[in-house]
Amino acid sequence: MASTASEIIAFMVSISGWVLVSSTLPTDYWKVSTIDGTVITTATYWANLWKTCVTDSTGVSNCKDFPSMLALDGYIQACRGLMIAAVSLGFFGSIFALIGMKCTKVGGSDKAKAKIACLAGIVFILSGLCSMTGCSLYANKITTEFFDPLFVEQKYELGAALFIGWAGASLCLIGGVIFCFSISDNNKAPRMGYTYNGATSVMSSRTKYHGREGDLKTPNPSKQFDKNAYV
């Protein structure tokens, strides 16, 4: 019962993390920078994995898509690949988890389902590592440029998408670890066994009682013979 509850918790945590990781791909604010005026913010610069934009004080945004993939910076290409891999691994991990959970009716025996659940945990861990690496790589580039005194271009700060990605990656890692430990709970489950004591004769208590009663009522022929001998 405890193993089933832990699998359900792991599934909910992992799916929540996968949804958060997936939501970072279309999110706009991976990095953001603002130009403040004397009274209001005059412009906001932001970018994600696909485009860079600027929004003026009236709320009008002008965006520019990134050029060809071969002309992109290496860290953006790496982040794209890692985040897409994280989303794909999370999708397959959710399928394996549904098959391997004890509360589902597919997957075969309990031993086979435990192995599938462990595989789902490994896949979710890989998904979390990919997402964590991609977000950390992007954040490292931002912080390096921000604290570089020789960098004269527009400096950015960490956007909301990075924190969402880190949170989703952490949930995927936690859920994957719980899935992996669920197989050890299945191995610790007690087995019902029966011991063989050999063939034994069975006699009911009623039969024994009647047998004893018959023995008590049976007269001794030797005693009757002795009495008749003296008549």
Swiss-Prot record:
Residues 102-115, 182-231 are cytoplasmic. Pfam families: PMP22_Claudin (PF00822). The keyword Cell membrane applies. InterPro entries: Claudin, Claudin10, Claudin_CS, PMP22/EMP/MP20/Claudin. Keywords: Cell junction, Cell membrane, Ion transport, Membrane, Tight junction, Transmembrane, Transmembrane helix, Transport. Residues 22-80, 137-160 are extracellular. It is found in: Cell junction, Tight junction; Cell membrane. The keyword Ion transport applies. GO terms for molecular function: structural molecule activity. GO terms for cellular component: bicellular tight junction; cytoplasm; plasma membrane. It is a multi-pass membrane protein. It catalyses: Na(+)(in) = Na(+)(out); Li(+)(in) = Li(+)(out); K(+)(in) = K(+)(out); Rb(+)(in) = Rb(+)(out). The chain crosses the membrane at residues 1-21, 81-101, 116-136, 161-181. One of its GO terms (biological process) is cell adhesion. Forms paracellular channels: polymerizes in tight junction strands with cation- and anion-selective channels through the strands, conveying epithelial permeability in a process known as paracellular tight junction permeability. In sweat glands and in the thick ascending limb (TAL) of Henle's loop in kidney, it controls paracellular sodium permeability which is essential for proper sweat production and renal function. In renal proximal tubules, it conveys selective chloride over hydrogencarbonate anion permeability which is required for renal chloride reabsorption and salt homeostasis. Can form homodimers both in trans (interaction between CLDN10 molecules in opposing membranes) and in cis (interaction between CLDN10 molecules within one membrane). Interacts with CLDN19. Belongs to the claudin family. The fourth transmembrane region (161-181) is necessary for integration into tight junctions. This is Claudin-10. It comes from Bos taurus.
